[in-house]
């Protein structure tokens, strides 16, 4: 099963820059936090650590995803996790009228205005993606 954002964008008939993926990280100081980044980019772990007040941050192991969030890989939504974790959304969302994020089930997306997602998740926006080398 193709869980990539490229596949999701093609199924939706939308540009890839409108499809965001939800990643859960663990910082050395803050514990768990969430990054929502454009689907065609990778999260910059150093940038994520910096904005979340950590010296170091890593993606959580896949086996922790369900117990920590209540979601499985490919169906992790920034909305409705077991607990409200600090959330950071890549700043490119601000230039878009709507973005897509997982609805919490594989294959199901939510189309939402970035401002609404930011308000609902109490997120901060930041530059979170790795630069092309």
At which residue positions do the language-model features occur?
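Extended, low-hydrophobicity, polar/charged segments
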Residues: 1-133
């Amino acid at each position: 099963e193709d869980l990539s954002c490229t596949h999701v964008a093609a199924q939706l008939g939308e540009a890839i820059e409108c499809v965001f993926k939800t990643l859960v990280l663990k910082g050395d100081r803050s514990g768990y936090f969430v990054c929502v980044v454009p689907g065609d980019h990778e999260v910059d772990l150093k940038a994520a650590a910096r904005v979340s007040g950590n010296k170091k941050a890593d993606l959580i192991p896949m086996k922790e995803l369900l117990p920590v969030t209540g979601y499985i890989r490919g169906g992790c939504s920034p909305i409705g996790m077991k607990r409200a974790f600090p959330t950071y959304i890549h700043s490119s969302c601000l230039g878009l009228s709507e973005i897509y994020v997982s609805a919490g089930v594989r294959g199901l997306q939510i189309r939402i205005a970035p401002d609404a997602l930011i308000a609902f998740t109490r997120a901060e926006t930041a530059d979170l993606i790795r630069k092309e080398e």
